[in-house]
C-alpha cells in the first residue's frame, strides 16, 4: 500500500534524502510554519518529516491519518509528544550524528573567545594596527586553552566527545549531569571553577533559564559561556547584562530563544567584542547532515517495516 510522506521544511537540511524502499507518494516543501499550512499540507499523510516545524496538540487533532513524525534532529521540543502519544502517533528522532560537528564548533568558539580572535581581526580591519606605536597591542585579553578548566553541563555522548578533545588540548575537565555517573561534580563546582562552560542538555521545563543572573554571578570574571544546545537554557537578558558589566568574560552562542529571530534578538543585535553568535549551524557540517539524512530515511523505513527505531517517549 502506498504511503504518503511529506517533508515540511526540506530547506533546513542541506543533504541528499534518498528514495524510500517502500511504495510511496513523496512531497516536500521548503518551509512550513503556520498551523494552517501544516494541516493543509499533511492532509492524508501518514508520515510527516520535520526539523523545526511546531507540531502542537491543536494541529495534531486535525490530522487523523498521521501515524509517524520523523524529526530530522535530536531535540524534539517542537513536538507535543504527550498529544502525539494520545493520538497514537509515533515520534522518532536522530541520534549520534553530531559526534564531530558539534564538538568542533564548541572548540572553535572556545578558541575564538579565549584568544580574542574576532575582535583583534576586526580591529585590524578598522585600521588600529596601522596606527599602533608598537608592533602589537593588547586591547583584548588573551588566555591559554592548555591548563584551563572546561566545565561540561550535560555529560551525554556530545559532552563526552567534547571532553576527549579538551583533554587532548591539555584542559582539565569537570562535568555535571542530572543522571548519576562516576567522576561527576555538582553544578556549583562547574560554575565557580570553570574557565569555559559549555551546555549540552535538552530544553525542558526544568532546564529553561537554568543559567540566569544568579548562576552568572558565580562564574569567574574571565569565564566563557558556550551554548550550542537550546536558546531557552539561558536567560538572555541576564547574559547580555553580565557581558556588558564584565561579570563574565564572554559568550559563544549557536542558539537563541526564538529562531529565526525575525523580530530581533538582544544577543544577535548586540555589538560586543566578547560575544559571538552563529545561526544554529553547529550541527551542520556537510558530513553530519548526510549522516542525519540517511538516518532520517532509515527511521521512516524501519517504522513502515513494523520495526520502529529511535522512538522518543512522551
Curated annotation (Swiss-Prot):
Domain of life, per lineage: Bacteria
Reaction(s) this enzyme catalyzes, per UniProt: (R)-glycerate + NAD(+) = 3-hydroxypyruvate + NADH + H(+)
UniProt KW Oxidoreductase keyword: yes
Gene3D superfamilies for the chain: NAD(P)-binding Rossmann-like Domain
Keywords annotated in UniProt: Cytoplasm, NAD, NADP, Oxidoreductase
Disulfide linkage: none
InterPro entries recorded: D-iso_2-hydroxyacid_DH_PdxB, D-isomer_2_OHA_DH_cat_dom, D-isomer_DH_CS, D-isomer_DH_CS1, D-isomer_DH_NAD-bd, NAD(P)-bd_dom_sf
Main location: cytoplasm
Metal-binding listed as a keyword: no
Cellular compartment(s): Cytoplasm
SUPFAM superfamilies: Formate/glycerate dehydrogenase catalytic domain-like, NAD(P)-binding Rossmann-fold domains
E.C. no: 1.1.1.29
PROSITE patterns per UniProt: D_2_HYDROXYACID_DH_1, D_2_HYDROXYACID_DH_2, D_2_HYDROXYACID_DH_3
Functional pathway: One-carbon metabolism; formaldehyde assimilation via serine pathway
Function of the molecule: Plays a central role in assimilation of carbon. It converts hydroxypyruvate to glycerate as a key step in the serine cycle, and may also play an important role in C2 reactions, by interconverting glyoxylate and glycolate.
Other known facts: Uses both NAD and NADP.
Assembly: Homodimer.
Name of this chain's protein: Glycerate dehydrogenase
Originating gene: hprA
